[in-house]
């Protein structure tokens, strides 16, 4: 007989949906260990603006893959998959269940389905692309991508030089488009995965929570935290860390764009848009059980029932 696959739990959801609170309750009741699935929580020194679990919450439920990088560093879906698999193996070896909690859907997808065989970065080709962009502009580079790979060009904005450069680089290295290569599946996740998404039933409730969270962040010192990053000489607005919602709007404010109140308003709007994209992605997700964030007891019961099924 084949050995049964180890269990794993995905706890997904839009920002401000109550994922952390539910994860803490789950850890009290089940033999689980938490792994963060969040492209912002990986950064050190970015605590308030990312709504990182506080010291008390981390004491109740330690999260792996939090505070692992400096904001100068980049972190890909491939990096996450590698690190998450290592942490999952370690948790299973302890006789526990990995509980992956967060809202970065691309990370979940990479972990669940594996990654396409994309070529490694090539510094020479990347430098050549950047030189062309300096000469002709990123709009012209985007037009070039439209000719080569219209599907990727539709998804990638001309003002996103990192992703635009990568799409062109992939084609120049491999002779295949990013669209072609991403259709090739990688290794599937060797776990029995139970997938849940938590959200309030009403969209207005998400909006209310986002506004409340932003108000709390400002009271806790988000402006000072963001300014400390801005005053570093090794950070700039195009880094993935600084493109995180909230930080980007504060950065623009420090650059002289509008008032602090306007920056906060833009941050709230950007966070709402993020939540909307997360919900749209989750609605297309297969084999997903939805949980009501206003009924934690009911959510715990649903999770318990599903875990005991197999």
UniProtKB/Swiss-Prot annotation:
Site (Interaction with substrate tRNA): 104, 126
Region spans: Interaction with substrate tRNA: 38-41, 162-166, 243-248, 276-283
Keywords carried by this UniProt record: ATP-binding, Magnesium, Nucleotide-binding, Transferase, tRNA processing
Residues where ATP binds: 13-20
Binding-site residues, substrate: 15-20
Obligatory cofactor(s): Mg(2+)
SUPFAM superfamilies: P-loop containing nucleoside triphosphate hydrolases
GO terms, molecular function: ATP binding; tRNA dimethylallyltransferase activity
EC number: 2.5.1.75
Catalytic reaction equation(s): adenosine(37) in tRNA + dimethylallyl diphosphate = N(6)-dimethylallyladenosine(37) in tRNA + diphosphate
Major enzyme class: transferase
NAD recorded as keyword: no
One of the GO BP terms on file: tRNA modification
A Pfam family hit: IPPT
Family classification: Belongs to the IPP transferase family.
Subunit structure: Monomer.
Physiological role: Catalyzes the transfer of a dimethylallyl group onto the adenine at position 37 in tRNAs that read codons beginning with uridine, leading to the formation of N6-(dimethylallyl)adenosine (i(6)A).
Protein name: tRNA dimethylallyltransferase
